[in-house]
Amino acid sequence: MSELTTIARPYAKAAFELAVEKGTIESWNEMLFFAGHVASNEKASALLAGMPTATTQAELFIQICAEQLNEQGQNLVKVMAENGRLIALPAVAQLFAKFKAEYDKEIDVDVISATPLVAAQQESLVAALEKRFARKVKLNCSEDAAVVGGLIIKAGDTVIDGSIRGKLNRLATTLQS
């Protein structure tokens, strides 16, 4: 996946810069999300792989996407097809969404707890995390009984393990050393 990310980065960056310039970030995000799903669809990929030229690949892809792609989106598809990079479209969509979140000063935070968090706990957690990261926080909560108690918080490259399971593991490691 890292190779696809490397391939996708210049396309995503160019699309994002154009979207910022034109004030069409949200429509580009939706367009790339849709195109990424089409590119990752097995049947569509097989059909596109059977096309003899990049031009016919691009034309077919644009037909499949129909009205979902504006003129700039169609141009992106044509350039990517000419360079044999349509397979990287899902990664382009992911990177674009990441650039959008950074631009909007938003961060996705995954929270794992032993039991479901009530609304008041979620609000308190969001307030504390927004203060810590200086960004708007989008909370994604999940439960895992293995956590035992406490929380595991994952935000980008940051992991905060405040779970009882994590504390027990650290204690066991300390005792073994």
From Swiss-Prot:
Subcellular location: Cell inner membrane
The keyword Methyltransferase is assigned to this record: no
Disulfide feature: none
Protein name: ATP synthase subunit delta
Role, per record: F(1)F(0) ATP synthase produces ATP from ADP in the presence of a proton or sodium gradient. F-type ATPases consist of two structural domains, F(1) containing the extramembraneous catalytic core and F(0) containing the membrane proton channel, linked together by a central stalk and a peripheral stalk. During catalysis, ATP synthesis in the catalytic domain of F(1) is coupled via a rotary mechanism of the central stalk subunits to proton translocation.
Gene: atpH
NCBIfam families linked to this entry: ATP_synt_delta, PRK05758.2-2, PRK05758.2-5
Homology family: Belongs to the ATPase delta chain family.
